[in-house]
A protein has these predicted regions:
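Extracytoplasmic
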Residues: 60-63, 82-87, 96-104, 115, ...
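Second-shell loop/turn segments in exported
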Residues: 74-78, 118-126, 141-146, 209, ...
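C-terminal solvent-exposed extensions
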Residues: 51-55, 62, 112, 256-259, ...
Length: 365
């Protein structure tokens, strides 16, 4: 009969072995992640070129990033000198780990720098991430200093590594997605199978017909759709929906899948966030949750400016208030800066007065 003391020592020894294995496993995983992070492009931002407005009190306790998607799907494409057709502001509550995403519509009329009022997506092409961040800061009363940029090829690779996504589709979305798939497949070198259209065509082409399993090419093509009734507002909503699905699947994925995503995607990412900062975030990533998403401006009209149709915030001041309420829980005491007031007046002047604005709010997607 074994002695109690020996049993206790044996049990303690087993626990020590398990702890040692977990520690070694943790070091292995850490090492694997650390080596893969070297694949990410981390250019040094010229901080002297980043302009900010005020640091409003409601931003305390939050971390804010700018996320840019570049409409360039070649693996060898540079992640600069391109229009940022996806512009997302990510606000993170440092205490609750809740993340809120706000898309800035690509055709929004804003000052992209040096009193150049044009579509917001042009800022990145004019001056890279520094100018795009400065536009967000000065036009939306923000203080963003870090960004992440990806191209479409990265999205395709990540979604394929996750095993695809189950996305609800309308007839109109099926038609446009199949059309976009041709170009996306050619430019990424990835294959796809067209979604079979129902016959006969439904009377309401915008009505969701069902959920379809889509691969990377199809999911990215779905994100590019902007010619349904919901126009660009629907496109940005689709993008945020896909991001949410990707986050949920990544949380449930095994470590091998995560490593595969890193191998495929990291070479197609550019960010100002340092490797040390990323490594420090990793232990808490599972606790982050996308709590809500929205689009900016929330209230808008349309106007022809410089022979192009643009989205005009109605008004810029009111929309910035709503944005800060959404991102940071700002109360009625928050008032936009004088820069916002002056920019709003300039926008109204450029469009020829508030009476020239056309209310063509799209149908919700």
């Amino acid at each position: 009969m074994a002695r109690p003391g020996r049993k206790k020592r044996t049990a303690l020894f087993i626990v020590e072995i398990i702890c040692l294995l977990l520690f070694i496993g943790g070091l292995y995983v850490y090492g694997q992640i650390d080596s893969r992070l070297n694949k990410i492009e981390t250019p040094q931002l010229d901080e002297s070129k980043i302009v900010t407005n005020v640091t409003a009190p409601q931003m305390s306790g939050y971390t804010t990033y700018a996320l840019f998607g570049i409409d360039q799907r070649s693996k060898n494409a540079a992640l600069d000198a391109q229009n940022s057709d996806t512009i997302i502001i990510a606000s993170i509550n440092n205490d609750t780990k809740e993340v809120k995403l706000a898309s800035v519509y690509r055709d929004t009329l804003l000052d992209i720098g040096n009193d150049t009022y044009t579509k917001a997506n042009a800022a990145y092409a004019y001056g890279g991430p520094e100018q795009a961040i400065s536009m967000l800061n000065t036009m939306l009363d923000l203080k963003i200093t870090d960004y992440v940029t990806v191209n479409f090829n990265a999205m395709v690779a990540a979604i394929d590594a996750l095993g695809g996504l189950d996305i609800p589709l309308s007839y109109a979305e099926m038609v446009f997605m199949n059309d976009y798939c041709i170009e996306t497949s050619q430019e990424t070198g990835k294959s796809y199978t067209p979604v079979e259209l129902p016959d006969p065509k439904p009377e309401n082409e915008e009505e969701i017909l069902g959920t379809y399993h889509l691969n990377g090419v199809q999911s990215v093509s779905y994100c590019r759709i902007r010619y349904t009734a919901s126009m660009d507002m629907g496109r940005t909503e689709r993008q945020r929906r896909v991001i949410g699905m990707m986050v949920d699947k990544a949380k449930a994925a095994g470590i091998t899948t995560i490593f595969n995503i890193m191998d495929e995607v990291f070479p197609m990412i550019s960010t100002s966030i340092t490797k040390t900062e990323i490594l420090n975030l990793i232990p808490t990533l599972m606790g982050y949750n996308i709590a809500d998403t929205t689009g900016f401006p929330a209230k808008y009209k349309f106007a022809d400016v410089k022979k192009a149709s643009m989205v005009v915030a109605d008004t810029l001041e009111d929309n910035v208030k709503e944005l800060h309420k959404f991102l940071y829980g700002a109360d009625e005491n928050y008032q936009p800066s004088q820069n916002i007031v002056e920019a709003n007046a300039r926008i109204i002047e450029l469009v020829g007065g508030a009476d020239t604005l056309v209310d063509q709010s799209p149908i919700a997607s």
